């Protein structure tokens, strides 16, 4: 499971598709709307029941059966939802009355504070058992990846570089965790995608560049994310059994430093979604089936009047959550649900 987390500045299935089927799959589009005081919504993740979480009007929301619900805060003015499990439990971060941002878990209408006074924290992923991962740090201290499980909080470590920090992004039902670890190596800052397997952190490497980020992990411990290549642009990757492989880009994709292709989510059939820069320099939402990339804008059955720019989640049924970003009338983001249609 899982979602893209904006924690690096550079910047889940019974539906097994073949490459041929991928070209024929079409989707209906549902506009998720916004919370009443906003014209913008960002979407994070979708569970097997089609429940969706994200952020609108600076508040975390849960979208279920066509209704968007404001999840509130921890006493402050801001909250963000980052993940939801198949039981409908939501995690994220929210401001307290004192202004600190704390990790939260929301269930059955109640938001619970996972944070500690004097620290900043965020929850980025949750599995079906309720095990939650994220980051916590005190003022002027680098963040440390955290696992909340069984009512206890545990820091799970980093790569041990000079000035190291780490963030856990996603966790599967086996307790395998994907995230990032940063620090300094040979006098330069480095951010690397990592996975914790049986409690041991593993550096996933890169694709000819220096940096990488893991965004999601599936039931088979396949990790997806992005990695720098030799020209400092970004390439989507999948990592499994010790090997990082580059995912293909759209034909003629125009890349530049810090820009290119990113994989943001994967379901348990290994279908990956994310974004890719097109031949005209626009960013489009994409899907990879058996390693083959398709622009999701070419698969929708009705005109939306918008360009889908990033896919952030995919569930077992193949439903995809996507965003459209525009600068018309100021920068706004709208969120949509794509539902695959039977052939």
Language-model-derived ranges and their functions:
Residues 2-10, 14-15, 19-343:
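Residue-level hotspots at or immediately adjacent to binding/recognition sites across diverse folds
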